[in-house]
Amino acid sequence: MIELVCEDEPEVVCLQELPVWGTSRLAEWSAMKAFPVVARPPRMPGRVGVRVTRMNQGFFRSAFVGQANAVLVSRSLVAEDRGYLRISDPGRERRVVQAVGVAGRYVIANLHANHGAEVAQLETERSRTFAETASRPGEAIVLAGDFNLLDLRLDGYSAASAGVVDHVLVSGVSVSTPVVWPRERRELDGVVLSDHAPVDVTIG
């Protein structure tokens, strides 16, 4: 899926729900600069966790291999890690938002919120505060990821995608209407590569 998303050479890609073992290969798979952050450490090391998870992917999912987020940036652009923040409360599945500065013009904040409207809204607000704190004067703010919210509005930010929980919200610069990938665009040999449809926008 990563190779498919990156084949038309986007400048920035935000990823969520990655297996932790895969973070070391992101730069190879994408041919981009990779900025990963672990949201939940694996319970089993390396390939052992992968093997167990493959026994029943739908049931085990990330329970054994852990979970990570990542921002990918074109190798032609200057980029810097601005850190990350846990956005989930104790007792809930560990979720984080990360920030990456790009080209001195943008701060990209990548998040994955928990399920439940009230919880997801709270984690979104925490992500927004983190992104705005991580930004520098003159930088536009991009808040992207899996918000787990269908009905999402943030004052001062662009409109969310319709009918999906993955969004790209932008403040401080013009942005195109979000384009949600149709099912056939994320299929390979009849297999749907992700249960989440990528969302494309053009900024600036």
Q: Language-model segments: which ranges?
A:
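Metal-dependent phosphoester-hydrolase catalytic domains
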Residues: 21, 77-88, 128, 132-142, ...
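Short, surface-exposed linear patches
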Residues: 5-12, 35-38, 92-95, 129-133, ...
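Active-site beta-strand/loop signature of hydrolases that rely on acidic residues for catalysis
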Residues: 1-26, 72, 100, 107-111, ...
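Structured beta-strand-rich core segments of catalytic domains in phosphoester-bond hydrolases
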Residues: 12-14, 18-104, 181-182
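Conserved residues at the C-terminal ends of beta-strands
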Residues: 16, 114, 171
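Short, glycine/charged-enriched secondary-structure capping and boundary segments
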Residues: 1, 27-30, 49-50, 123-124, ...
